[in-house]
C-alpha cells in the first residue's frame, strides 16, 4: 500500500515539478531542453531526488543542474501550491544519464547489425564464387 502511494506521489511530483520548471523558472541556464525523467521520494516524504535529462554539452548540463539546485526552494514553494502535502519534500536535482546510455547502446547495436550484414554479404559472395 505504501509503495503504491509513493509511486503515485513520485508521478504527481514529476508532473508538477516539470510544469513549474517550464513555466516559472527564469534562469538562463535552464533551457527548454530540460526534462524531468523521474522523481524518487524518501519513505518519510521529506526528501525527493529529481532526475533531469538535459540535451546539450557537458558544461551546459552541469550549469543547469547547479541552477536547478539553487532554485530548488523556489521550485518547491511553487510546486507545493499545486500538491496538498503536510510537508513538501526538499528537492535535490540529479542528472539522469540513462538517456545518453540508451543512445550509446542503440549506436553500438547499429554498428553490430551493420557488421553482421557485411559479414553475411561477404560469406554469400564466397559461396557463389565456389563451383
From Swiss-Prot:
Subcellular location: Cytoplasm
Main localization category: cytoplasm
GO molecular function per UniProt: ribosomal small subunit binding
Keyword Cell wall biogenesis/degradation: no
Domain of life assignment: Bacteria
Signal sequence, start to end: none
Any Gene Ontology CC annotation: cytosol
Keyword Cytoplasm on entry: yes
Alphabetical list of SUPFAM superfamilies matching this protein: Ribosome-binding factor A, RbfA
GO BP: any one term: maturation of SSU-rRNA
Keywords recorded for this protein, A-Z: Cytoplasm, Ribosome biogenesis
Similarity comment text for this entry: Belongs to the RbfA family.
PANTHER family attached to this UniProt entry: RIBOSOME-BINDING FACTOR A, CHLOROPLASTIC-RELATED
Assembly: Monomer. Binds 30S ribosomal subunits, but not 50S ribosomal subunits or 70S ribosomes.
Function in brief: One of several proteins that assist in the late maturation steps of the functional core of the 30S ribosomal subunit. Associates with free 30S ribosomal subunits (but not with 30S subunits that are part of 70S ribosomes or polysomes). Required for efficient processing of 16S rRNA. May interact with the 5'-terminal helix region of 16S rRNA.
Protein name, UniProt field: Ribosome-binding factor A
Amino acid at each position: 500500500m505504501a509503495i503504491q502511494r509513493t509511486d503515485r506521489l513520485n508521478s504527481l511530483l514529476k508532473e508538477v515539478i516539470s510544469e513549474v520548471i517550464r513555466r516559472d523558472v527564469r534562469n538562463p541556464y535552464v533551457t527548454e531542453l530540460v526534462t524531468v525523467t523521474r522523481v524518487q521520494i524518501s519513505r518519510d516524504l521529506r526528501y525527493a531526488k529529481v532526475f533531469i535529462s538535459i540535451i546539450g554539452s557537458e558544461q551546459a548540463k552541469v550549469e543547469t543542474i547547479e541552477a536547478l539546485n539553487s532554485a530548488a526552494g523556489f521550485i518547491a514553494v511553487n510546486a507545493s501550491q499545486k500538491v496538498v502535502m503536510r510537508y513538501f519534500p526538499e528537492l535535490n536535482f540529479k542528472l539522469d544519464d540513462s538517456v545518453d546510455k540508451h543512445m550509446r547502446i542503440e549506436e553500438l547495436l547499429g554498428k553490430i547489425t551493420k557488421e553482421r550484414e557485411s559479414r553475411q554479404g561477404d560469406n554469400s559472395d564466397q559461396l557463389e564464387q565456389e563451383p
